[in-house]
Amino acid sequence: MSKRKFALFCIVPMLLSAAASAQPAAPHDIIIRNAIVMTATHGTIPNGSVWIHNGKIQAVGETVNAPPGPHVTFIDAGGKYLTPGIIDCHSHIALNDDVNEATSPVTPQMMMKDAFDYQDKAIYRALAGGVTTSLLLHGSANMIGGQAVVIKHKYGATRDEMLFPNAPRSIKFASGENPKRVYGSRDQLPSTRMGNFAVQRQALVEAQDYMREWDAYHDKIKRNDKDKDKDSKDATPPKRDLKLEALADVLRGNLMVQIHIYRADEMLTEIAMAKEFGYKIRAFHHALEAYKVADQLAANNIAIATFSDWWGYKQEAWDAIPWNAVMAMRKGVRVAIKSDSEDFNRRLNQEAAKTIRYGGATEDEALKMITINPAWIIGVDDKVGSIEVGKDADLVIWDGYPLSSYGVPEKVLIDGEIYFDRQQPGLGTTHYK
């Protein structure tokens, strides 16, 4: 064979391969039919179907039809329940021993993404319980902790594939006994509740000063750009401070504030401080005394992420009652049931069901507490949390009634792909790339 023919022999397959890879991927359609579809936001469809197109929900109803073709996969639910994927808005899984940077009471520059262990089997265990999205938070050792990361439970996927795309940023604040205990045991500030809030207030004052410095710098650049005799390069930027930069984002509304808190009096103090500095509180986490101040929470559009009936495990939990979630909800508070546990996250459906027993929540109200409400707390309710057209196809097929101790997930889909199948328990490990 001549050199020229040999070269063509080698190049042509490469060109064909490149051309093939350049072609758009064939559309992928899934139709789940014969399901009891619990949408979370628009009631239940007794004999419903869901059409998924390229990972998004395309249609929901009693009868849906996808374009015919070999690319359509049919899943017969066999009359079983179909719900949105469960969302845990307070989790510490896959962070191992890196939950708390307890070297300073103010550490907003910490990023939980840097501690995220995407191979942690706890991700898969939660997935097996129907959890598809989690907010991984800094711990509660510090008055102002680090920045959270939002993940999808695509166990076996790459690290970047697990990160929830374009999720809003959140930061963890904490008040009460935990910061007191951590720093008080070292005989340093804070060691009291007044110390806690003094530390928080001082950090926010410093952030205000930092913002003013940067605002003045940017104003000078704008003035110099308008003045032909001046160069914008003449303006000297302030020194960057990652801690104050993060807190400035809080004050600008670019970082949602999630607060670990138990007592009613502390909630009122945090509300007052937020008004003092002009930022919004997204949610109070734990919030076991929310029932005492539910009117104030509703008036300020502050959600709670709470336990169903966990109480008495620490001093701050002595006034907890199992009716807390429903009492707050009846006052207009957006309520989520969260785990804060590698065990509870697999049973959040049962925890939500307890609100039906304690307080008389309806089926839809209970389901919202583990789907659309925590999605709102995380800031992703436009993408997940309900079975609606245009949302990510994060879905769970249950082998029994989901709001009971008898229903367990049979299949869990994330972005239209099956990541858990009870009949194929090793499915997730095959996704590793």
Where are these regions (language model features)?
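Active-site core of metal-dependent hydrolases
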Residues: 41, 47, 112-113, 137, ...
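Divalent metal-coordination and catalytic microenvironments
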Residues: 35, 50, 55, 79, ...
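His/Asp/Glu-enriched, well-ordered alpha-helical/loop segment
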Residues: 97-99, 105-110, 256, 295-398, ...
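Acidic, glycine-enriched loop/beta-strand segments at the rims
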Residues: 24, 37-49, 62-64, 361-368, ...
